[in-house]
A protein has these predicted regions:
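The feature captures the beta-strand-to-loop junction immediately N-terminal to the Walker
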Residues: 114-116
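Helix-to-loop junction immediately C-terminal to a conserved catalytic motif
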Residues: 129
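Conserved ABC ATPase "signature" region
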Residues: 190-208
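Conserved ABC ATPase signature
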Residues: 212-216
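Catalytic Walker B motif of ABC-type/P-loop ATPase nucleotide-binding domains
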Residues: 238-242
């Protein structure tokens, strides 16, 4: 038995098939804070939840819209810095990946972090969330230095990352995917359901309540994945790694609207992408990095005027 538990710790908790709409959840450890892992490993195999038989009814939607999720009002003060990165450097495998990087993210702001493959965007995200630590420099959240904080403590303080290739449990519905995370933090089932209804209703996604992740469009999948990252804690800074990747134009437009709604909730957002023109219309500020160095910084309306800079730092395929 001990050998089997160790195997699950290294990989993931195996799913136990249920009957009807009841399932025992498969949960990856990456979704959890360190303090909740023991709870998960000892109890999750006995937990079951039923997906609602019908879509949200009118009464539920009214309750949801009267209890719209709102983050702390101070998060909407766009003149105050929430995240400050000062002269960060990082070497990986003997190669300098980031060189003296500095940036500021204000409350309620959307910041674009652009650059070609290998520019250092993902490394910077990993430094912010605490997957790796800087060799030099300083990271502050709300003016508190967090350089030495591990990933789970940074998550508790309100930093969340949605990686490009990480997402939902494909055989589970939107409701089940959100429930699987919320049940680790909320004991009252009715409160969990209320929270899910609020989230889905606020973003107009209630029609996905019974849709399995494998049957969602690319845009729908990314929206529910994002909600999974913000549903169980007071997120202050949301990092989105190429949220437009592999999406059709209609889905890109929908995701951009969704990100603006996240900003309107009070979240501060950093987006990575290769394509300046795909996201420039939703950005408050933009930073272009190349070979681990900040090359261009400023409002999109100023950067878009510099065709030579865009072609040089992002590639000759870009045109104005």
């Amino acid at each position: 038995m001990e050998k089997e538990n160790n195997k699950n710790r290294k990989k993931k908790i195996k799913i136990k098939a249920g009957t009807g709409s009841n399932k025992t959840f498969l949960l990856k450890r990456e979704f959890l804070y360190k303090e909740t892992e023991t709870l998960l490993l000892t109890n999750i195999v006995n937990k079951k939840v039923s997906t609602p038989e019908k879509d949200l009814n009118k009464a539920q939607l009214n309750v949801a819209s009267s209890n719209i999720i709102k983050l702390n009002e101070q998060n909407k003060n766009t003149n105050k810095k929430i995240l400050t990165i000062s002269k960060i450097s990082k070497t990986l495998g003997g190669k300098p990946v980031l060189k003296n990087i500095s940036l500021n993210l204000n409350h309620g702001q959307i910041l674009g972090l652009l650059g070609p493959n290998g520019a250092g965007k993902s490394t910077l995200f990993n430094l912010i969330v605490g997957k790796i630590f800087p060799d030099f420099g300083e990271i502050k959240l709300n003016n508190e230095i967090i350089n030495d904080l591990p990933i789970h403590k940074r998550a508790i303080k309100g930093i969340s990352l949605l990686e490009q290739h990480k997402g939902l449990f494909g055989n589970m519905t939107a409701y089940e995917n959100l429930y699987a995370i919320l049940e680790l933090h909320i004991e009252d089932k009715s409160k969990i359901e209320s929270k899910i209804f609020q989230l889905l209703s606020y973003f107009g996604l209630q029609y996905l309540v019974n849709v399995k992740a494998n049957n969602m469009s690319g845009g729908e999948y990314k929206k529910i994945s994002t909600l999974q990252r913000i549903c169980n804690k007071d997120i202050k800074v949301l990092l989105l790694d190429e949220p437009m990747a592999a999406l059709d134009p209609l889905s890109i437009s929908s995701i951009k609207k969704f990100i603006l709604e996240l900003r309107d909730m009070g979240l501060s957002v950093i987006i990575t992408d290769h394509n300046f023109f795909a996201i420039q219309d939703i950005l408050d500020n933009c930073i272009i990095i190349r070979d681990g160095v900040v090359m261009v910084e400023g409002p999109p309306k100023d950067i878009i005027k510099d065709q030579k800079a865009i072609k040089y730092y992002l590639g000759t395929g870009f045109k104005i």
